[in-house]
Regions:
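Catalytic cores of RNA-modifying enzymes
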Residues: 1-197, 201-235
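Accessory RNA 3′-end/elbow-binding domains used by RNA modification enzymes
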Residues: 1-63, 67, 211, 215-339
């Protein structure tokens, strides 16, 4: 059973599960920042969060969008106060590379499921390219039967697994870019997609297969980008482990392994305030905007003081109203992560 590639479950910010090993309980600590993990195939997103949380001894951790166990690639993991910025990342664009296997439609819409229907037809590159514009822009998409979408309070994948008929309503999604990259043989096509929140690549592969009369499912899937995080930010699990062990041995600092919290807010304007105003914001109090640009500052802003991230606030009617305040006591990610 597979999980959706683009859903933030209610328990995404969760504690690491108890593995049942008789290890000495260590003291949890305040760790704040982002790890952009290059998740390996076979690992669930929840387990990846648990591993990172354990390595850092962090009190709190969560991910910014589930990645299927059979998928690899970019999984943004927030530690500590960074979990408050998860919604800003989840709402960002995603980019995927994926391979479609023609000739078989499966009940999970990926290689893990059972074959539900077959076709002898195989599309050529010209037919695939001619179809892609129909699947670009705002389109209607039905989520996979095996997905975390809720039906009368039940997850669709639980209903499907129990043998119940699952009828899911189509939803409007946005696909910004869809390209054919390669066709290594008649049975496979490799594509890239840049899409918005709520898009299922498994459904996209299924619908392309049906439209071409060839049927198909996702044979391989890799996520390359989520919001502000891209391939250059990714770090393999083995490297995270090595960096944490080096820091524990006094050969570095954990802060050097983390991206700053505000990395998740790259597209939000930044505003600097005085230490006195920063203290007021952290107490939940609004402060007056000052300076010649005060009258034109509008909307959501990220606020810093003395180079330290303070709050996410809203500028309105000549004042800044705090919406999320941050306490970065402890270990906090900083610019220029070392690898």
């Amino acid at each position: 059973m597979t999980l959706p590639i683009d859903t933030l479950p209610a328990d995404a910010v969760a504690a690491a599960p108890d593995e049942g090993r008789p290890t000495k309980k260590r003291q949890k600590r305040d760790v704040h920042g982002w790890i952009v993990l290059d998740k390996p195939i076979g690992m669930t997103s929840t387990h990846a969060v648990a591993v990172i949380k354990h390595l850092y001894g962090a009190k709190r951790a969560g991910h910014a969008g589930t990645l299927d166990p059979l998928a690899s690639g970019l999984l943004p993991i927030a530690l500590g106060e960074a979990t408050k910025t998860v919604p800003f990342v989840v709402d960002g664009r995603k980019e995927y590379s994926f391979t479609i296997r023609w000739g078989e439609e499966r009940d999970t819409d990926d290689a893990e499921g059972r074959v539900a229907a077959t076709s002898e037809s195989r599309p050529d590159a010209a037919a695939i390219k001619a179809l892609l514009p129909r699947f670009t822009g705002t389109i209607e998409q039905v989520p996979p039967r095996f997905s975390a979408v809720k039906i009368d309070g039940e997850r669709a994948y639980d209903l499907a697994r129990s043998g119940e008929t699952v009828e899911l309503a189509p939803r409007a999604i946005e696909i910004h870019r869809l390209e054919l990259v390669d066709q290594p043989d008649a049975d496979h096509a490799m594509l890239t997609a840049e899409c918005g929140k709520g898009t299922y690549v498994r459904s996209l592969a299924r619908d392309l297969g049906r439209a071409l009369g060839a049927l198909g499912h996702v044979a391989a899937l890799r996520r390359n980008r989520v919001g502000p995080f891209g391939e250059g930010d990714m770090i393999p699990l083995e490297q995270v482990e090595a960096l944490c062990h080096r820091a524990a041995a006094g050969e570095g600092h954990l802060a050097d392994t983390l991206l700053p919290i505000e990395t998740a807010l790259d597209d939000i304007p930044a505003l600097a305030v005085s230490p006195a105003d920063a203290a007021r914001l952290q107490r939940g109090q609004a402060v007056l905007l000052r300076g010649r640009d005060a009258s034109i500052v509008r909307g959501i802003v990220q606020v810093a003081s003395g180079g330290q991230f303070v709050a996410i606030a809203e500028a309105e009617r000549g004042e800044i109203v705090p919406r999320r305040v941050f306490n970065l006591a402890g270990i906090a990610g900083r610019a220029g992560r070392k690898g």
